[in-house]
Amino acid sequence: MTQFIRKDFQVDEPDKTAVIRHDAPAPRPWEPSGILYLIGLPGSGKSAVAAGLARELGCPARTLPLDDPDAALEHIFADGPAVVEVPYKLLLGEVFRQRLQSTGRVLYLMASVEAMAQRLATTPEEQEKARERLGRLRTAYEPLIMQTLQLMAPADAPLDEVLADVLERVRM
């Protein structure tokens, strides 16, 4: 059995009180916008998962363009809830990463280099080149991704398993 530590704290300001409500859910920063951002490297399954999530959640799937993503975000906000695929190159800007975090939930689809290479290439030679390129991308972008994410889901499994896992995480 777990033993809880109980301490008596003397408050210097006895007129101040805190009210903890159990009848109302705690506010969550992403609820007003209803935006779920999917981030990950090429081949992690962002497009496929975005389409599946959009279908399951009853909202559109969008992809941010590399040119003028801020304007695209404004249109997305105006349209309401959406699942938004974010190209990894957009994560270079710190202000943009902060904007993602403050306007929705950011979910990282974390796939192995091997799985991403298999999805992107059709021949063994292409897979080797893809593995090398993806390894370099992971080294460069994963620190930025880790600074940005709020949720993370493994993405090596088949699409239906990844989608089920992501849905469970999103609905928490």
Regions found by a protein language model. Give the residues of each.
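Conserved phosphate-donor/acceptor-positioning beta-strand/loop module used by diverse small-molecule
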Residues: 100-123
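Hydrophobic anchor at the beta1->P-loop junction of P-loop NTPases
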Residues: 38
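An amphipathic alpha-helix signature
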Residues: 47, 113-121, 131, 163, ...
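Structural recognition of the conserved hydrophobic beta-strand(s) that form the central parallel beta-sheet
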Residues: 83-87
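Extreme N-terminal, non-catalytic leader segments
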Residues: 1-34
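Conserved substrate/cofactor phosphate-moiety recognition/catalytic segment
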Residues: 41, 46-82
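Short glycine-rich anion-binding loops that position phosphate/pyrophosphate groups of nucleotides
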Residues: 88-91, 112-114, 158
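Small-molecule kinase domains that catalyze NTP-dependent phosphoryl transfer to phosphate-bearing small molecules
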Residues: 126-165
